[in-house]
Amino acid sequence: MKRPRALPTYAVSIFMAGDIETAKRHIRRCCYEDALCVTVTPTTFIYTAGEEAGFTVGFVNYPRFPRVPSRLRARAMKLARELMRECCQRSALVMDASRTDWLTLDPPALARSKSP
């Protein structure tokens, strides 16, 4: 029997509205190409004057695919930006134990309409 491997605990989460099936298709490709293991969980966002379905993506420092915290967070940030485009969303949150980043993106059509 192999000896269990242990790593320091570190987790990063992405929070985003949008279609979970679209997100899972993209995440599946990313995991296949980049040796990742993540969780994908449906969630509901309730906020002032509204409600939206979405999902969370959980990254953990999985011993099979170990990464230092800075690389794990960077990969979560990259995936969040990719998912914003794939799921046609304007924003996402990336959160770990010490920091939350709110990412925003103007859709290409909106960005073009702002140009002179």
Question: How would you name each of these model-derived features?
Answer:
Residues 66-109:
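Short, compact, well-ordered microdomains
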Residues 15-17, 41, 60, 95:
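A structural detector for beta-sheet-dominated domains
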Residues 52-58, 101-116:
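Short, low-order "capping/linker" segments at domain edges
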Residues 20-44:
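Short, flexible N-terminal segments of the mature chain
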Residues 36-73:
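Short, intrinsically disordered low-complexity segments
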Residues 19-27, 65-72:
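Short, conserved charged micro-motifs
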Residues 6-18, 56:
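Short glycine-/aliphatic-rich beta-strand segments at the starts of folded cytosolic domains
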Residues 1-7, 47-49:
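Short, flexible, solvent-exposed loop/turn segments with mixed acidic/basic and small polar residues
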